[in-house]
Amino acid sequence: MKVYNLENIKSAAELKHRTEVISMNERSIIVLDTFTGIAQKLQAVSISLFHLDIEKVMNQLQDFENDCGNWLDNLLSSEMQKAEAAKEIKVHIDQISRLCNENPNIIDDHEIMAHGAMISSLILSHYLEECTKKNFILNSCHFMRLGLDRKPDIKYVKKNVEELMKACPDVPILITQSRL
């Protein structure tokens, strides 16, 4: 099994270039870091939320949604694929919005950033699908755990990843998040 670590992705062009080497001939796992621009925009949302500026948060989320649309426009040619991806991304943006409106003073910025990691995974997944590279997103929350030393519990991770992989034996490319 081949493991690809994709980090510091700043543009759709860079994502295209970095994924060209991913082979369909062997099972692969892509460990994806949140795209740089997505992380920066969501960090700004967290800062505005810390200051309890909900109006600014909502404007930033709208700008963020538009930015996600730009990623899709630059990566996907199929309007149907774009619509499907936008719909899935919107679920995460709506969840962030609800969190910000319901409990603005107790929300953890890690929760906001986790949505950014999933959105980045969705964008990559839809791009690979359009390139006819069958893939599946493994949510790292379902298999990642840190030990007492604050490092990944390798035995736990291995056992749970193997279980998740059994659910998709015919999928050559698995996508997971580097930080959730």
Predicted regions and their residues:
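Nucleotide/pyrophosphate-binding catalytic subdomain
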Residues: 1-180
